[in-house]
Amino acid sequence: MLELSAFELAERVLAREVSASEAAAAANARVEEVEGDLNSFITGTPELALERAARVDERLRRGEEVRPWECVPIAVKDVLSTRGVRTTCGSRILENFEPVYEASALLSFGPDPIMVGKANMDEFAMGSSTENSAYGPTRNPWDLSRVPGGSSGGSAAAVAAGQGWWALGTDTGGSVRQPASFCGLVGLKPTYGRVSRYGLIAFASSLDQIGPMTRDVRDAALLLQAIAGHDPKDSTSAGVEVPDYLSGLERGVEGLRVGIVRELVEAEGVEGEVREISLRTARALEEAGARVGEVSLPHAGYGLPAYYIIAPAEVSSNLARYDGVRYGLRVPADGVHEMYRRTRERGFGDEVKRRIMLGTYALSAGYYEAYYGQAQKVRTRIIEDFRNAFSGYDVLLSPTCPTTAFGLGEKVDDPLAMYANDICAVPASLAGIPAISVPGGLSGGLPVGVQLMGDYFSEPTLLRAARAAEQASGLRFRLKP
């Protein structure tokens, strides 16, 4: 059962060939088997998963409508609010925080989302390796000496190891796509506003987006079908009709225009074999009928520094709410200002403190226009670059990451080296366009992801291209370790 895709498992549960309870029990057993090696979860919810699975089975017995995504156990990144289940954001400052409401993305799963646990993550989603968690690092199921990527590394490890059939992650500057690449999965960042952010604890509000992490593209399409749509509780939620993401998935890429992004394929630090796998994927799409050419995003090289000004600036504002007064950790002290200082000093980790300071500096009087204002101008230029590119191409292609998964501890003390991992991912985040990472091949026995990017709300086309790329790679999901 653990080898099935989420789509296949849903088919079998709905056909009453297996029960949701059996699926939940299998996931729980797998968590118990490998969690000691991986540390995929901050909070396990095995009993809750069994209770909810039993209710799904009862609804099926009564002949009630049960949608495919309601049948499949899921791992949930610990940045999404779950009513009555602690939600830590990987931080000590929220160690005992239990939300009183559920994130809208989880409400999409009906009354009984079969959640196997809250997945580990970099603290407040700030990181590229899941080493910044206050609850210990997560290890990559492909090689336990390596990172799974971040910040959604726990979600990626859980899916790769079969601790759940799929997972919800969040992507601010690559945090779904990069761990998907490192763990041999499909990771989709939808168009900004396609999925409600209500109940998502904010990192950078103009960038954060919830996305699927799955075993294959068909599962990603099914999970997006579940969570996409307008939500009046989220002012940034787009009132754009949700299409059927599965209907055209197998149509192929005949006539599709695919542009290879020169600046990202040739970016500094991109390993030769990673570059070759991306170009090989482009050739495979061309052989399948796509029209492939080269395209330029002239300002893509400025995306990384712009991102690391804009995102910390939003962090500085968003994390001001953690003061020990309303919720979360409170460290006693003489006087309210000393209590603020001690609470934040003890509650936040080093990377979070670093980004708060960077953001506060960028927003300070005398520096706002020189840093934040200029970064926003770069963001506008990148949006214009994509607009020009999509006038001639339907899908753009690049590596997802410059390298394969690196070793635990290798970059954790070198912030600039860690940030450089995001060089291929941040342009799509700054523009708010959809982007997906699909397995393209192996380098040194480790998975390499290829990134495809589409125009706003073009997820059906993007998923169709990703499905063709996935099939061309010849790779098939296998449980690790």
UniProtKB/Swiss-Prot annotation:
Q: Which GO terms describe its biological process?
A: translation
Give the GO cellular component terms, alphabetically.
glutamyl-tRNA(Gln) amidotransferase complex
Specify one Pfam family: Amidase
Record keywords: Nucleotide-binding included?
Answer: yes
**Gene3D superfamilies attached to this UniProt entry:** Amidase signature (AS) domain
The alphabetized UniProt keywords are: ATP-binding, Ligase, Nucleotide-binding, Protein biosynthesis
Q: State the reactions this protein catalyses.
A: L-glutamyl-tRNA(Gln) + L-glutamine + ATP + H2O = L-glutaminyl-tRNA(Gln) + L-glutamate + ADP + phosphate + H(+)
Q: Write out the catalytic residues in the record.
A: 77, 151, 175
Keyword ATP-binding in the entry? The reply is yes
What GO molecular functions are on record for this protein?
ATP binding; glutaminyl-tRNA synthase (glutamine-hydrolyzing) activity
State which Enzyme Commission number(s) the record gives. 6.3.5.7
At the top level, the lineage of the source is Bacteria
Its function, per the record, reads:
Allows the formation of correctly charged Gln-tRNA(Gln) through the transamidation of misacylated Glu-tRNA(Gln) in organisms which lack glutaminyl-tRNA synthetase. The reaction takes place in the presence of glutamine and ATP through an activated gamma-phospho-Glu-tRNA(Gln).
Task: Kindly state the subunit structure of this protein.
Answer: Heterotrimer of A, B and C subunits.
Its family remark reads: Belongs to the amidase family. GatA subfamily.
* Protein's UniProt name: Glutamyl-tRNA(Gln) amidotransferase subunit A
